[in-house]
Amino acid sequence: MAVGKNKRISKGRKGGKKKAVDPFSKKDWYDVKAPGSFTNRNVGKTLVSRTQGTKIASEGLKHRVFEVSLADLQNDEDNAYRKIRLRAEDVQGRNVLTQFWGMDFTTDKLRSLVKKWQTLIEAHVDVKTTDGYTLRMFCIAFTKRRANQVKRTCYAQSSQIRQIRRKMSEIMVKEASSCDLKELVAKFIPEAIGREIEKATQGIYPLQNVFIRKVKILKAPKFDLGKLMEVHGDYTAEDVGVKVDRPADETMVEEPTEIIGA
């Protein structure tokens, strides 16, 4: 009697079940370091796959862009509405050295500035710094009521808007083209350019809330490690905790321990 193939009996798979591998076991953490223009140099940590064959870990980290709040970089909550973009340029040991790569405003801050009864004036300009970076800077400003003004509205005329926009562009070009990127970032943090524009346009129409709201880097020069190290300075210095003196009345008193059954 011929015995046929029983299709109901399932065959066991070869090799059995595959062992689950934790993907993080093949990755390493690197410290992200901000340029010397900022107070807090430790931005955070980033993850990358370990060097395997031709795939080098440091190459996978280069040109990564990190977005950080200026409040964290300056330890000042008043700057929470600014977002700073930092691009990874080089890897030194476990440290990722970054360079300024742009700036933007948070959406809620921009929306809070726009109000009724005033004119919004915007200008943008392309500038080149002394160290070869080409940037596009966007400026925003709002008209305000003159002193002792009774009328509720403060709308500027078209001719005044054109004059203000021209003045904005002139000041942005003058401030950016006369310094390198590091010095320009130092001007962005305290909003020095915005105050300069506000002062210069006072005779045309009084302005308020004048900000460089956005900065985009269009073109960067060829990578130079020497210049990057100048920007970072001593990046190896780690944050050390501050020693706290314990008050005399808080000193711990050792109490005798009672041994049960002795």
Swiss-Prot record:
Signal peptide region: none
Query: Highest taxon of the source?
Result: Eukaryota
Its Gene Ontology molecular function terms? mRNA binding; structural constituent of ribosome
Spell out the residue ranges making up region: Disordered. 1-21
What InterPro entries has UniProt attached to this entry?
A: Ribosomal_eS1, Ribosomal_eS1_CS, Ribosomal_eS1_euk
Family in the record: Belongs to the eukaryotic ribosomal protein eS1 family.
Protein name as it appears in the record: Small ribosomal subunit protein eS1y
Gene name? RPS3AB
